A protein has these predicted regions:
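C-terminal active-site "lid" helix and adjoining low-complexity regulatory extension at the edge
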Residues: 249-277, 281-288, 295-329
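Internal hydrophobic scaffold segments of catalytic domains
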Residues: 1-54, 197-234, 301
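Extracellular structured ligand-interaction cores
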Residues: 129-131, 189-193, 206, 288-290, ...
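Short, solvent-exposed loop/turn segments at secondary-structure junctions
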Residues: 138-141, 176-177, 201, 211-215, ...
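ATP-dependent carboxylate/phosphate-activation module, predominantly the ATP-grasp catalytic core
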Residues: 184-185, 189-272
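Active-site nucleotide/adenylate-binding loops and adjacent lid/helix of ATP-dependent enzymes
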Residues: 82-201
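Acidic carboxylate-rich catalytic motifs and surrounding loops in phosphoryl-/glycosyl-chemistry enzymes
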Residues: 113-117, 211, 289-292
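Conserved N-proximal alpha/beta basic substrate-recognition cap immediately N-terminal to
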Residues: 9-124, 140, 276
Length: 329
């Protein structure tokens, strides 16, 4: 019933404008008629659970039925998440303060929960710091995050009285990138997304991992660029794909730093994998998690754990030259 309810909500909330623009984009990229694209989209929704964005970003218009069956689509991803993760425990990941407390062994930085803090607590936290990082309690994808210079606000009362701070729920130390990660882009934490699955025998498996990289002045790496990482060698496997996946932009060289993406050697990959495998056992009721991991000069730390894992990271055309999706994995 929950699955059918989700499907109904998605269809009800579908945007005709976005659907139309997606059909136009698929038409331009494939050369097929808009009517043929629309009818094929409807078939792929019914047969493979593929939404219109899935159809575009995975280039379903270029795939055979056998290839289409290998892709984790939006509805398959949602169904798998609902099966693997007990919703009663997901708040331990979604709420920043609860996550930091439960996973303190892995986070590698101090934080302050403003709902429980006083102005005096904030002033003490900021002592000796040039900058702090601010987050809302439960928003995702970097929405609402700010990096503030401590010298820019007159007193700690800013966090309690200023309208600009109403969304801030936690403040924390600014994460410093490992020098080899900073070379990729130095204005954001370039994090690895590592997906783990905890099986019925309590064994943790790493399904895939990608390196996210900031771009064009952004202070976060969300919606910038990313590429899969080889867990054995620690090297980036392919050119990076735009984080705004429908754009289909591919970056062989980082436009801001001039670094060649494919083949870049990342530090501490084995250590990061070992860390998330350990973290995956902390809340065994949540078995399918996307861990955002930063590599600092002192080693890897966990930024956050995501209970709804993006299904596009490992399946985009520039990263799947064999046109085979995640399901066989």
């Amino acid at each position: 019933m929950a699955e059918k309810g989700y499907i109904r909500r998605v269809i009800k909330q579908a945007s005709f404008e976005k659907l139309s623009s997606t059909i136009n984009a698929a038409h331009e990229r494939s050369g097929k008629s808009k009517l043929a694209i629309f009818l094929d989209m409807c078939w792929c929704l019914a047969r493979y659970g593929a939404g219109y964005y899935d159809y575009l970003i995975f280039r379903f218009y270029d795939l055979t039925p056998a290839q289409r069956k290998t892709y984790i689509t939006r509805f398959i991803s949602k169904k798998f998440n609902m099966y693997m993760n007990d919703v009663n425990y997901c708040d331990l990941f979604d709420n920043k303060d609860e996550f930091y407390e439960r996973f303190a062994e892995f986070t590698g930085r101090s934080f302050l929960d403003l709902s429980k803090a006083t102005a005096e607590d904030v002033a003490k936290f900021c002592e000796g710091k040039e900058r702090i990082f601010c987050k809302p309690r439960s928003k995702t994808c970097g929405i609402g995050c700010m990096r503030l210079n401590v010298a820019d606000f007159e007193s700690a009362e800013f966090f309690f009285n200023d309208p600009a701070a109403t969304e801030i729920y936690t403040i924390e130390d600014v994460i410093v990138n490992h020098p080899d990660v900073r070379k990729l882009y130095d204005n954001a934490v370039n994090s690895m997304r590592i997906i783990t699955l905890l099986d019925a025998n309590k064994e943790v498996h790493v399904l895939y991992m990608v390196q996210k990289i900031g771009l064009n002045g952004s202070i976060i790496d969300n919606n910038c660029m990313f590429s899969p990482v080889d867990p054995e060698t620690g090297k980036i496997k392919y050119p990076a794909h735009a984080g705004d996946t429908p754009l289909g932009i591919v970056y062989e060289v980082h436009p801001n730093t001039g670094i060649t993406i494919q083949g870049y050697q990342l530090p501490c990959v084995k250590e990061a994998i070992a860390m998330v495998k350990k973290a995956a056992l902390v809340v065994p009721q949540v078995r399918y998690v996307g861990w955002d991991v930063a590599v600092t000069p002192n080693g890897p730390i966990i930024i956050e754990g995501n209970t709804y894992c993006a299904h596009d990271f490992w399946q985009l055309p520039p990263h799947t030259p064999d046109k085979i999706g995640m399901i066989p994995t």
